[in-house]
Regions:
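Loop/turn positions that initiate beta-strands
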Residues: 274-281
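Short, conserved secondary-structure segments in the cores of folded domains
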Residues: 269-273
Length: 284
C-alpha cells in the first residue's frame, strides 16, 4: 500500500512547473543518476534526543519526492528503540499512531515510529480466522519471537542488538534444538511453514492452527503447555509439558493457552511416542 500511495503522488505531481536545478537554487542530491534540488520543509525536536525532518525533492522534469526521517541520539538515557506488534499477536494490524497509543504505559511513552515489513492484506487460515496483518517475514518484539523467517530465503531483517545498536542482515532461526529423553532434533521454525526434517513451534499468538493441511498424514503434532508468563524467545531454554495426544494433522487446533510442536521427516520419531505429562526441552 505504501508503494501505491507513493507512485500516485509522483503521477499527480508530475504536471508541476519544471525548472532547472540552478533556477531552483539551494542544495542538490543525485539519486540513481538523476539530480534533485532539496528543500527542508520541517525540522524540529520531537522527543528526547530525537528530531524529525521533512524534505521536498524536485528534479528538472518536475518529478517530486517527499522524504521523512528521524534522527535519534541512542546515548540519551531517556530514549530507547523497541519493536512492538499491533495486536500483540501474529495477525491483526494498526496504524503507527494507534500502536504507539495502545502500547504507551506509565513510565514508557512511544512518541515516534516507522512501519516495517510487508504483511498479508487478505486471506484466512484453514480454520477460517483472518490472517490479515500477519507479517510476511520474521517478527520479534520485546524479545518474543512472533514469527521466524522462511528457511528458503535470506531476506534481510532490521534488528536492535543487546547493546542497542541497529543492524540490517539475514537472521537464521534454525540454530535451536528440541530434546526428549536425551534425543535431539533441530528446531527449524516458529509460527511459519514447517521445513522438513525438523521441529516447528506454534504459539497461542498464531492463527489457532499450524495452518498446513497439505502435510496432513506426513507430520506428527503434539499439544504442549509452557509455564505461565514464559514465552518463545531467542537464546532461551523452554520447558514444555505434553497436555494431549499426538496427531498427524498439519491444521490441528491450537487450544487457548497451549502450544503445538510439529515434526516432519526424520524428526517425527522424537515426538511420536510422547504421552500426557512427558516433558520436552527446547533451546531457541
Amino acid at each position: 500500500m505504501r508503494k501505491q500511495i507513493f507512485l500516485s503522488s509522483v503521477l499527480l505531481l508530475g504536471a508541476a512547473l519544471t525548472m532547472s536545478a540552478a533556477e531552483r537554487g539551494g542544495r542538490t542530491v543525485a539519486l540513481a543518476g538523476v539530480e534533485y534540488s532539496v528543500d527542508t520543509l520541517f525540522h524540529a525536536k520531537v522527543g528526547p534526543g530525537t528530531t524529525e525532518t521533512s524534505l521536498h525533492l524536485v528534479n528538472e522534469t518536475g518529478q517530486q519526492l517527499r522524504v521523512f526521517y528521524l534522527t535519534t541520539d541512542l546515548t540519551n538515557p531517556n530514549t530507547s528503540i523497541e519493536a512492538i506488534v499491533a495486536q500483540d499477536k501474529v495477525p491483526g494490524g494498526g496504524t503507527v499512531s494507534s500502536m504507539a497509543k495502545s502500547h504507551t504505559v506509565e513510565g514508557k511513552n512511544y512518541f515516534c515510529g516507522v512501519n516495517t515489513d510487508f504483511f498479508h492484506t487478505s486471506g484466512s487460515a484453514s480454520n477460517g480466522k483472518s490472517i490479515v496483518g500477519a507479517p510476511v517475514r520474521a517478527s520479534v518484539a520485546g524479545g518474543e519471537i512472533y514469527r521466524s523467517g522462511s528457511a528458503s530465503t535470506s531476506w534481510p531483517n532490521i534488528f536492535v542488538d543487546r547493546d542497542g545498536k541497529m543492524n540490517i542482515g539475514a537472521v537464521s532461526f534454525e540454530n535451536g534444538t528440541v530434546t526428549v529423553g536425551g534425543k535431539t532434533a533441530t528446531l527449524k521454525a516458529i509460527n511459519n511453514d514447517a521445513p522438513d526434517n525438523g521441529i516447528s513451534i506454534y504459539t497461542p499468538k498464531y492463527y489457532g492452527t499450524p495452518n498446513q493441511p497439505w502435510i496432513n498424514g506426513q507430520c506428527v503434532t503434539v499439544p504442549v503447555t509452557l509455564e505461565e508468563g514464559d514465552y518463545v524467545g531467542a537464546g532461551k531454554t523452554l520447558k514444555f509439558k505434553v497436555c494431549g495426544a499426538t496427531g498427524t494433522n498439519g491444521d490441528c487446533a491450537i487450544n487457548d493457552g497451549e502450544y503445538v510442536l510439529l515434526a516432519r521427516g526424520s524428526a517425527k520419531d522424537l515426538l511420536s511416542g510422547l504421552k500426557v505429562g512427558d516433558e520436552v526441552s527446547a533451546y531457541v
